[in-house]
Amino acid sequence: MLKQRTIKSLVKTVGIGLHSGRKVTLTLRPAPADTGIVFTRVDLPEAVEIPVAASAIGDTRLASVLQKDGARVSTVEHLMSACAGLGIDNLYVDVDAEEIPIMDGSAASFVFLLQSAGIEEQNALKTFIRVKKAVEVREGDKLARLEPFFGFKLSFTIDFRHPAVDKTGQTFSIDFADTSYVREIARARTFGFAHEVEALREMGLARGGSLDNAIVLDEHRMLNNEELRYGDEFVRHKILDAIGDLYVVGHPLIGAYVANKSGHGLNNQLLRALLADQEAYELVTFDRVEEAPVAFLPQAQPAFA
């Protein structure tokens, strides 16, 4: 059977909050079967636990933000993307600030952290959400859609009129039946424009942003000395974000995701639209491994995992 997964041992790291610029300590702990992924603000007078759920996402202007009882945990999408890519179902995430550390701006540090803790299967069936009919949300020319598909694949189109982005691919598709998340997606860094960073800093945000944790572009070129990690790193990062945004639904999705210029807000609207239509999805488990989509098979786990 396809089993749930958690990590074998506690693991901890320290990083910088993208917006606060402050030091953040992140601790990942094993969680029992059927726990899900639970974020806890351990710095508050009374710790607040926030289980991931589509309905728990509040602010989505700059990142995906979990909210509960006035407590917030921001910028969860890169860690959630790593959890999805490695097939982690159950995890306690303790953080002593209101945002997850940005690390290098990709999911690679979180993949390394989870792998260094060790990943173990649990004696419980992994539950999937299978998309049964197409669900779509739009905002102007922005679009996000989920379609029935026996596996997990994504296609994303961006539209940034910028010389450095134009030289790379603006559309990227990936099917995890035959492609590795760790190799092809995890290392893609977040990116932004210098004038936007300055505007955010004037608002007291992006204080931790730097060339060490983002690709930064001026009007004509990339300011980083380091070359792109992928020829089309910009759109691959949007795929990375989408994987993390979708995983807050609480289970891996069996389906196809298609997006044009989507972002955290539209991705969350898509999940809510899916869950609002009981005919659009079903919960499934697989007693026999060979009945499951190839993307989620144990031998493929170094692939989508």
UniProtKB/Swiss-Prot annotation:
Gene3D superfamilies: lpxc deacetylase, domain 1, lpxc deacetylase, domain 2. GO terms for biological process: lipid A biosynthetic process. GO terms for cellular component: membrane. Keywords: Hydrolase, Lipid A biosynthesis, Lipid biosynthesis, Lipid metabolism, Metal-binding, Zinc. It catalyses: a UDP-3-O-[(3R)-3-hydroxyacyl]-N-acetyl-alpha-D-glucosamine + H2O = a UDP-3-O-[(3R)-3-hydroxyacyl]-alpha-D-glucosamine + acetate. InterPro entries: Ribosomal_Su5_D2-typ_SF, UDP-acyl_GlcNac_deAcase, UDP-acyl_GlcNac_deAcase_C, UDP-acyl_N-AcGlcN_deAcase_N. Pathway: Glycolipid biosynthesis; lipid IV(A) biosynthesis; lipid IV(A) from (3R)-3-hydroxytetradecanoyl-[acyl-carrier-protein] and UDP-N-acetyl-alpha-D-glucosamine: step 2/6. Its cofactor is Zn(2+). The active site is at H264 (proton donor). GO terms for molecular function: metal ion binding; UDP-3-O-acyl-N-acetylglucosamine deacetylase activity. The keyword Lipid metabolism applies. Its EC number is 3.5.1.108. Signal peptide: none annotated. Zn(2+) binds at H78, H237, D241. It is an enzyme of class 3 (hydrolase). Catalyzes the hydrolysis of UDP-3-O-myristoyl-N-acetylglucosamine to form UDP-3-O-myristoylglucosamine and acetate, the committed step in lipid A biosynthesis. PANTHER family: UDP-3-O-ACYL-N-ACETYLGLUCOSAMINE DEACETYLASE 1, MITOCHONDRIAL-RELATED (PTHR33694:SF1). Belongs to the LpxC family. This is UDP-3-O-acyl-N-acetylglucosamine deacetylase. It comes from Cupriavidus necator (strain ATCC 17699 / DSM 428 / KCTC 22496 / NCIMB 10442 / H16 / Stanier 337).
